[in-house]
Every structure is written in structure tokens, then in C-alpha cells.
Swiss-Prot record:
Catalytic activity: L-serine + acetyl-CoA = O-acetyl-L-serine + CoA
Family listed: Belongs to the transferase hexapeptide repeat family.
Gene: nifP
Origin species: Azotobacter chroococcum mcd 1
Stated name of the protein: Probable serine acetyltransferase
GO cellular component: cytoplasm
GO terms of molecular function: serine O-acetyltransferase activity
């Protein structure tokens, strides 16, 4: 594909993914992400691994768009950086077709060694603002990476990964995939603190009901925690059992204050 054809495809995809885009002139003059990818396409054609200095188009792209794309990176057609700013794409990064990045995304390395050290993104991947994808890992086709996530492990196809470190929170079926939908499932971000609190509230509610029903022995001897808790979590055990504070089946009557006083008096005799 010629350079002009690549530029044309990169511009067309903007109208499919950004509802604010109105005219080609507007896209060409006001979209820094488009400026960055156009200059990258030129620099990539001129780049040679051992050539010094780097193509001037790379420097120009940084000054104009505040986007740093190494000319050695391999980027497929119809690539779009929305709100292009503070995006970094390393030398050995590989990006498939129809990929969308938002501002603040880093496709970085975790080692200074030569060779493959940056991530590979499959086709139709969407990466939210501020996300960091680090190391020679693979993000499968149609995957979604939530905003501000830090991903250091492979992500299967069709999955949504969110959080620090990134965790898979949703797997989409083929019929559920929306190539350009901004469905990052941020509401599924893991919340271990909230989960632990939910466990405790569930336990308190259960104990209160048993106490009100008069089941003091049963409440003290066996308690079931919030059903969604992780059995391996020491805070949220699904079957926590405590020994009863009395040996017989009947609760022991607390000593009256007067009895304790009289007991001390008897002991002093």
C-alpha cells in the first residue's frame, strides 16, 4: 500500500470512531494524533536500524503532536490516537489493524536488553487513557484495556482487562464484540476492600437475625459469610466456625454484680 493510501485510511477511520469529527480539513489541521501517525508512516519508510540520525519526521512528530512513536514500530492500517498527547510506542511494538489508543498510553519495555521488548497488540484493540502495557506481551484481538490499567501479562482475545496490575474482568462472545464501541467495563474493576466490607456486613446481618430469633448457640457456633467471598481470603472465609463460649447447650447466665461482690466477700472470710 502506498504512503498516500495509508494516510487516506488513517483519516477515514477518524470519522468512524470520533463523533466530533466533521470534515477532513478539520481532522488534518486539528487532530494531533493524526499528525503523529502520518509523520510516523513517513518515518517508518525512511527508517533503517543502524541509520543515524533518526528521520527528521520523528522529531517533527514529537514537536507537533507530543506523541513519541519509534519509527521501527510496526503499525497496521486504520490506526487512531484519540486526543493524541503523551503517547509512547516503543521500537519493537507491533500493532494490528483498526487499533485505537487514547491519550497517555504507553507501549513500553521492561528491560534494556536488545530484541523484542515491547508489546504486541492484535486487531481491533482499544486501549483506554493512561494505560500502560509493558514488556513483550500479547494483547489478543478485540481486547479492551481499561483506563490507567497496568498490564504486564498476556491478555486473551475478546477480553477486558482493568486495574493495577491488570486483571481480566470480562470475556465477550464473538457476537458481542463492537469493533469501535468504547465499552471498557470500568465498573468491573476489582475492589478487594469493598468485598471484605461486604463480607463483614453480611455476617453482621446474619448474626443479628439469629440473635433476634433466639438462636444464640447456632449463631456463635457456625456462621456463613458473604457467598461471593474468596475461600482463600482470611478475612472472608465461606465457612468460619468458632467454638461456643459455653460447654453446655444452654447459655450461661452472666453473674450479677451483687453476686460478684458477695463472692469476693465470701472469699475474704
Amino acid at each position: 500500500m502506498s504512503l498516500l493510501a495509508q494516510w487516506r485510511e488513517d483519516i477515514r477511520c477518524v470519522f468512524e470512531r470520533d463523533p466530533a469529527a466533521r470534515t477532513t480539513f478539520e481532522v488534518l489541521t486539528t487532530y494531533p494524533g493524526v499528525h503523529a501517525i502520518m509523520l510516523y508512516r513517513l518515518a517508518h519508510r525512511l527508517w533503517r536500524p543502524n541509520a543515524l540520525p533518526r528521520p527528521a519526521a520523528v522529531v517533527r512528530a514529537r514537536l507537533v503532536s507530543n506523541v513519541d512513536i519509534h519509527p521501527g514500530a510496526v503499525i497496521g492500517a486504520r490506526f487512531f490516537i484519540d486526543h493524541g498527547a503523551c503517547v509512547v510506542i516503543g521500537e519493537t511494538a507491533e500493532i494490528g489493524r483498526d487499533v485505537t489508543l487514547y491519550h497517555g498510553v504507553t507501549l513500553g519495555g521492561t528491560t534494556g536488553a536488545k530484541g523484542k521488548r515491547h508489546p504486541t497488540l492484535g486487531d481491533v484493540v482499544l486501549v483506554g487513557a493512561g494505560a500502560k502495557i509493558l514488556g513483550p506481551i500479547t494483547i489478543g484481538a478485540n481486547a479492551r484495556v481499561g483506563a490507567n490499567s497496568v498490564v504486564v501479562q498476556d491478555v486473551p482475545e475478546g477480553c477486558t482487562v482493568v486495574g493495577i496490575p491488570g486483571k481480566v474482568v470480562k470475556l465477550r462472545e464473538a457476537g458481542q464484540l463492537n469493533p469501535y464501541g468504547i465499552d471498557l467495563d470500568h465498573h468491573l474493576i476489582p475492589d478487594p476492600v469493598g468485598k471484605a466490607i461486604a463480607c463483614l456486613l453480611e455476617r453482621i446481618d446474619s448474626l443479628e437475625k439469629r440473635v433476634e430469633a433466639g438462636g444464640l448457640v447456632a449463631a456463635a457456633a457456625s456462621s456463613t459469610f458473604y457467598e461471593g467471598c474468596n475461600p482463600d481470603n482470611s478475612i472472608c472465609e465461606t465457612n468460619l466456625r468458632r467454638s461456643a463460649p459455653w460447654s453446655s447447650g444452654r447459655p450461661r447466665r452472666p453473674a450479677h454484680a451483687g453476686d460478684r461482690v458477695s463472692g469476693r466477700a465470701k472469699g475474704s472470710d
